[in-house]
């Protein structure tokens, strides 16, 4: 069973909020889409008063359960390289897949959890679509 982790892109402040800083994901009202994130800028300790921050304009990204060749956790929205090709990680409703960054419709995709050889990952995360938009624009090698 994989770890359930999230990270959040705060659109207003243009910064990534990591899993260890997320205090609460709020689902207010009907539906399956969260509409508020409560987080702290500091590492959370049970002995200190927490300076809570609220985020309403965000993108929530789930951890795939897979790490890259440098043991970096892979999340939705990450950009990775596999066989000299760039991919963006998306969730298709059943599995995490890497979609060819050109999104031409004629592109290639791969299952993130299938990019392993002899128990080690053959992919490397090079950034994400929020903080490294230029990486996608560069295209494939």
Task: Report each predicted region and the residues it spans.
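Secondary-structure transition motif
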Residues: 1-141
């Amino acid at each position: 069973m994989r770890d359930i982790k999230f990270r959040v892109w705060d659109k207003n402040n243009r910064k990534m909020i990591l899993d260890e800083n997320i205090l609460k994901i709020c689902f207010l009202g009907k539906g399956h889409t969260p509409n508020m994130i409560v987080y702290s800028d500091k590492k959370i300790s049970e002995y200190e008063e927490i300076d809570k921050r609220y985020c309403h304009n965000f993108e929530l990204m789930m951890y795939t359960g897979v790490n890259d060749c440098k043991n970096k956790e892979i999340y939705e929205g990450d950009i990775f390289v596999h066989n000299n090709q760039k991919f963006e990680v998306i969730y298709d409703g059943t599995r995490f897949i890497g979609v060819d960054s050109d999104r031409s419709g004629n592109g290639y995709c791969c299952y993130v959890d299938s990019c392993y050889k002899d128990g080690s990952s053959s992919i490397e995360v090079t950034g994400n679509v929020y903080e490294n938009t230029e990486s996608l624009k560069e295209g494939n090698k």
